[in-house]
């Protein structure tokens, strides 16, 4: 590419205002790129439950310059306690601290995380437009001409598809690529008052995998992965009772907690689907990141982490190269193997729980994941 430096005279367009899109906006603004983020949801809503963030995410937040505000919004912990299906503790896995003076891991509410990232992206100078999607785009030598769903148009140097597992951008760029695949499992989530002294992630093994994650000093959330043959639809009315029933065969401590699941509106249910693009994640001036390229199951708690790391690496490579082709190729080389490991290792746990593969030792898998993600990106 010749002429003006990309992202300087014309902005970079980020499609998707979730975790990956917002961290991309912050990272790009740090490098001096002009950024516009569009998000299809006019309310910019997120699930009201929590999310697990591992040590590599805390390191990334430090690189983004927002670590202290981020940590203050959640609950830190350094240990994963693993329990057998009957409730007996079988392992205690210490997570590595990658930053002195900060916890190894963090549980944080998704709304709190959205607030930290959205406020930080705007403060960094990113333009964020809500209730807008891409209607069409044309690519030429000097950039992209994009038409939006609100009738407006714009010129951009690069388009980043950070629009999730059902990515509109992926479908447009790679129409022949396989779509998301249902795993046979779903995840249920629900918030509870915190347990005194609960300063670890507690993970329960079994056909139904359950975890308890602190997200503030007085709040935690429960997640449960359940077999869901045929990918059924559950009506919202009565879904709290359905979730309670799913936990009826779990450890006594989980059954006792389940009695508090009474609010249908508080239940978050999501079928688990995965996708892993083994070919390039880019074509021309369009590039994918996060779930749009490599959606994983939550068994290792690294889906958001991989998207955040993608954002940092992509911004770095765009700053280091004079052409989009060179930058995108370098980004893909650095990210593909790491993201594929997370997708495959998480899916192996899922298949083991479903009886479709060998049972995976969760403590061993978690320790291995900590070691892999502690490595520089």
Model feature map: region roles:
Residues 2-12, 54-174, 178-185, 189-191, ...:
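Conserved N-terminal helical subregion
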Residues 235-268, 332, 337:
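Flavin-binding catalytic cores
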Residues 20, 43, 166:
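Conserved Rossmann-like nucleotide-cofactor binding loop
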Residues 13-38, 160-161, 243, 266-352:
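Conserved mid-domain beta->alpha element of the FAD-binding
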Residues 366-377:
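C-terminal auxiliary extensions adjacent to catalytic cores
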Residues 190, 198-232, 236, 240, ...:
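Active-site substrate-recognition segment that forms the wall
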Residues 41, 50:
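Residues in the short beta-alpha loop(s) of Rossmann-like NAD(P)-binding domains
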């Amino acid at each position: 590419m010749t002429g003006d430096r990309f992202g300087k005279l014309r902005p970079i367009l980020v499609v998707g205002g979730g975790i990956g899109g917002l961290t991309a906006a912050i990272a790009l603004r740090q490098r001096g790129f002009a950024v516009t983020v569009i998000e299809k949801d006019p309310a910019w809503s997120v699930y009201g439950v929590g999310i697990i963030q591992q040590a590599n995410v805390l390191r990334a937040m430090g690189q983004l310059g927002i670590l202290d505000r981020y940590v203050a919004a959640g609950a830190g912990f350094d240990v994963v306690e693993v329990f057998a299906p009957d409730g007996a503790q079988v392992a205690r896995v210490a997570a590595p601290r990658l930053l002195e003076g900060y916890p190894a891991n963090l549980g944080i509410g998704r709304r709190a995380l959205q607030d930290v990232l959205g406020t930080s992206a705007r403060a960094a100078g990113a333009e964020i437009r809500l209730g807008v999607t891409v209607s069409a785009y044309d690519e030429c030598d000097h950039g992209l001409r994009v038409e939006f769903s609100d009738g407006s148009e714009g010129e951009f140097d690069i388009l980043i598809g950070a629009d999730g597992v059902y990515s509109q951008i992926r479908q447009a760029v790679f129409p022949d690529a396989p779509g998301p695949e249902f795993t046979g499992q779903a995840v249920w989530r629900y918030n509870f008052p915190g347990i005194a002294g609960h300063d670890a992630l507690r993970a329960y093994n079994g056909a139904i995998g359950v975890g308890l994650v602190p997200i503030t000093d007085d709040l935690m959330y429960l997640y449960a992965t359940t077999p869901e043959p045929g990918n059924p639809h559950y009506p919202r009315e009565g879904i709290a009772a359905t979730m309670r029933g799913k936990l009826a065969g779990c450890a006594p401590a989980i059954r006792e907690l389940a009695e508090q699941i009474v609010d249908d509106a508080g239940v978050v249910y999501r079928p688990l689907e995965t996708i892993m693009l083994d070919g390039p994640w880019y074509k021309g001036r369009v590039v994918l990141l996060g779930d749009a390229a490599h959606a994983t199951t939550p068994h290792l708690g690294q889906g958001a982490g991989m998207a955040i790391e993608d954002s940092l690496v992509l911004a770095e490579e765009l700053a280091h190269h004079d052409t989009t082709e060179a930058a995108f190729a370098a980004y893909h080389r650095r990210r593909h193997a790491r993201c594929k490991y997370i997708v495959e290792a998480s899916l192996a746990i899922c298949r083991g729980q479903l009886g479709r593969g060998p049972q995976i030792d969760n403590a061993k898998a978690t320790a291995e994941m900590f070691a892999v993600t502690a490595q520089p990106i």
